[in-house]
Amino acid sequence: MWWWRRRFWRPKRRWRWRRRRRRPLARRRRRPARLARRPRVRRRRFQWGRPRRYRPRRRRRRRKRQKIKLKQWNPAVTKFCRIIGYYPLIICGEGTTVRNYNVHSQDYVQYESYGGGMTTTMFNLKVPYEQFQLHQNFWTRSNIDLDLVRYHSVKFTFFRHPKVDFIVKFNRNPPFTDSVLTGPMLHPGVLMNSKRKILIPSWETRPRGKKRIPVRIGPPRLFTDHWYFQRDFCGVPLLTVNATACNLRYPFGSPQTKNICIYFLVLASIYNDKVSIAKDEVTKNYDTLVDAIKKSPQGLTVFNTFKTQEHMQEPSSETCKETQKTNPPFKYENLSSLWGDKIYKESTFNSFKTNAENLWKARSKHTLLGSKELNFKTGMYSAIFLTNGRLSPDYPGIYIEVVYNPLLGQGEGNMIWLEWCPKKTKQYNERQCYNLIQHVPLWAAIHGYMDFCKKTFKDNNLDKNTRVVLICPYTRPQLYNPQKPDWGYVPYDYNFAQTKMPDGNGYIPEFYRFRWYPSGFHQQNWMNDLDQCGPFSHRGEEKMATLTSKYNFKFTWGGNPIFQQTVKDPCKQSTFDIPGAGGIPRPIQIVNPKYLDPGITFHRWDLRRGFFGPAAVKRMQAESTDALFPTTGPKRPRTEVPVAVAGDALPSRERKRQAWQDSTSEETESEAEAQEEKTLQEQLQQQLKEQRQLRCGIQYMFQQLTKTQLHLHVPPIPQ
């Protein structure tokens, strides 16, 4: 055969250095020569045929412009500036998944968890300046004596966390406000089904990939790109960043648990009309509750708990003595709750109210005042009534233990609202209930709910004076009464049922010893557990998780400043051990844009023959020096997104008044109300003050009108 001597391997090839092939230059292709037009020839047609029809030729008309371009001349001096810094969008401590980090970013926490699992952050020109004061960013150009500004864009870079995933979403569409549905829409289970979201997986979820995720965001929608005054532009919202922690590895349940359902406790129906903690109502409710328990079918079995003896018997201060064993040879002859029987000593029940009276009298002079019916030992909401630690689980207390499956909650028929604790009943009323969320699953409705209520009422201690009430037909048993469809149920924590603080501490501070009642403060763990049972929710298995971001804002400063040049004698300059090693280099001098008013800044046109004119000197003398001194921080974070509700959220001052105020405070209020009539001099001073305020308002109105006519007005700022 011819092929048996054929070599089946390739011969060794010699590699030679070749000269790099020169790439020809791209030449523009010339237009081909235009052919000569064919001469027109007349031809005779048959006379008996139909004449040929021609389509009329449409001539192209010049269209009218739909818009024109407006051009604005730049100022004499322009400086392009980048503001680069790092900002923690989310710091989520253990057990804070349900909270909004931006609301709690300025908290001073000692032993509790810090932060929250979601955030709604708004950025404007004030935020970079505040971060510059905190030494968390740097500016490439100074804005001193440059009172104009143009905004271009911003670039965010997110850094991946080792174990926790995050979801980020931007908003450039005005109005930049929050509504009652903002929190539910930011739950990971709902956010995963939305568009234009940015997933930031952890290194455990995606071991490979980029370390950073960059995103560029342009100016806001409906934004006009022209020069603005920095003083007017510093409060204009540029964008809002919404982010939340999530779990992309185990979206429907943690591998460390064997059940996706959660269970919690709610007050029984016996509390329907006895939930008010007002001073004139709590005493009547306490007596009615004790009598109703005694006449109920449960009877004395309500006291069949592990906490009864602890709360009804004082601790002994005597030392234990050795005694002889007196165990009888025969047992089980008598009924005893210690053996799981339903009978409890009737003497204990009769002494219940007496013990509450003694507890109040002995400690009323040595502790903060409150209400004796709300004490933590024998009050209306003590562990004797509400704890699930029963000696015999067959005989429950005056509570309902509820189980909720997040996979079966459709949301139709659900209702969650906020009401004040002095409210008499648990019935929904539009005038006495606020921030209603309905037809939304419970795990989504509770996401950031309490923090939104705090922003609405502008009260950080709102959770201690209000409670969250719900209606849900998707629990077992159903938290819905067909006979009373608008009556809700008050849930509470297991720590509250066992007379413990929300963090599990058994020591009760003096402030809460006679103010022990279910409120939003004692519903924190319930809200957090309900939020974590939803799909893609962060389980809070880490002590702390942080979403670190890097921002790069692009601005252009403009103005017409005076040329300043400072020259020093080089022979008298200070020296150092090493040339150039003068410690920390001084940063660029930055001025607060809020106080960069064009009226209090020198410009080139203020110079007259080398001197400042009298009008410029008079204008500068009117400058206030209050802004030069440091002040305390703002009451609310600069990055907080305002609420979309207009007007005051509190209809009256009586609803915000604490219900446990004693008679001394009432007498003080009555004395304050009974004031003497003002003298004529005081009335004139009051009228003069009002006229000055009116004059300032009119001047501000005409100033804004002038800016609007000159097209220098800024977009409306949400308050």
Curated annotation (Swiss-Prot):
Keywords recorded for this protein, A-Z: Capsid protein, T=1 icosahedral capsid protein, Virion
Q: Please note every region of biased composition (Acidic residues).
A: 664-674
Subcellular location field = Virion
Top-level division of the source organism's lineage:
Viruses
- Cite the Pfam families for this sequence: TT_ORF1
Q: Where is this region: Disordered?
A: 647-678
Gene Ontology cellular-component terms for this entry are: T=1 icosahedral viral capsid
Q: Which InterPro entries match?
A: TTvirus_Unk
Subcellular location, principal? virion
Q: Its function?
A: Self assemble to form an icosahedral capsid.
What family is this protein classified in? Belongs to the anelloviridae capsid protein family.
Name of the protein in question: Capsid protein
Instruction: Identify the species of origin.
Output: Torque teno virus (isolate Human/Germany/KAV/2001) (TTV)
